[in-house]
């Protein structure tokens, strides 16, 4: 992955004095996702890196693996499809945090988001403004999830909202059982939603980041 393709935050102190963190955005988003910027401001003791990911889960996992290999992050956070992507990425030395991982992505696309063309929510580095979701993609998601087991990081967490307005509450409960069975520690934000809220960030800070990175936290 070329350096010019990356979006890197510019929080002080200088980047080379902080550990690296990667943010993996969800479907219909990009490197300039608002959530990534919120996380980089809250956890500015890390040098945050992200890039544009596409709609192909297998390709996203390969792309994330390349980024991990190059930048050796200590922390990786992904939301929605980004949370799903990071669960399959090889990062044994990083703390993984999957927020509302979209294990039911195919059903969500078919029944909630809808097949066809859609606009991206933010400006992307690749210049793309629209993308297409197809039934073939949905089948590809299902095939990939069926054929692969989530991998663990140095520590692995999955954070869910009690009410997930996009994936559905029932799908969220099923996902909690699946990821918990794979070795991820499951945390639930009773005030959360699919789109990350301040309460979820507080939960991540208090229960994960502050404990996993005691020497790096403010």
Regions found by a protein language model. Name each.
Residues 1-15, 136-144:
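Short N-terminal or domain-adjacent regulatory/targeting segments
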Residues 11-12, 16-71:
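Active-site catalytic motif of lipid deacylating hydrolases and related acyltransferases
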Residues 23-27, 77, 159-161:
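Short hydrophobic segments within beta-strands
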Residues 32, 36, 40, 86, ...:
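Short, highly selective alpha-helical patches that border small-molecule cofactor pockets
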Residues 74-77, 95-97:
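Residue in the alpha/beta-hydrolase core beta-strand immediately N-terminal to the catalytic nucleophile
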Residues 77-86:
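Gly/Ala-rich beta-loop-alpha elbow adjacent to hydrolase catalytic centers
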Residues 89-90:
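Aromatic pocket-lining residues of Rossmann-like dinucleotide-binding sites
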Residues 95-217:
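The alpha/beta-hydrolase serine catalytic core
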């Amino acid at each position: 992955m070329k350096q010019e393709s990356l979006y890197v935050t510019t929080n002080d102190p200088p980047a080379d004095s902080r550990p690296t963190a990667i943010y993996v955005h969800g479907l219909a988003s990009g490197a300039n996702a608002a959530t990534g910027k919120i996380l980089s401001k809250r956890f500015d003791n890390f040098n945050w890196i992200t890039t544009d990911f596409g709609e192909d889960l297998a390709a996203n996992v390969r792309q994330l693996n390349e980024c991990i290999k190059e930048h050796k992050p200590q922390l990786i956070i992904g939301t929605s499809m980004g949370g799903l992507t990071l669960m399959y990425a090889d990062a044994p030395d990083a703390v993984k945090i999957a927020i509302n991982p979209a294990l039911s992505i195919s059903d969500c696309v078919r029944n909630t988001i809808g097949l066809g063309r859609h606009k991206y929510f933010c400006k992307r580095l690749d210049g793309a403004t629209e993308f297409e979701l197809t039934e073939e993609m949905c089948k590809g998601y299902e095939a990939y999830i069926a054929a692969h087991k989530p991998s663990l990081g140095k520590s692995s967490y999955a954070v869910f909202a009690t009410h997930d307005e996009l994936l559905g509450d029932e799908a969220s409960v099923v996902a909690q059982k699946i990821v918990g069975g794979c070795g991820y520690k499951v945390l639930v934000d009773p005030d959360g939603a699919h789109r990350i809220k301040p309460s979820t960030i507080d939960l991540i800070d208090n229960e994960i980041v502050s404990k996993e990175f005691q020497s790096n936290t403010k």
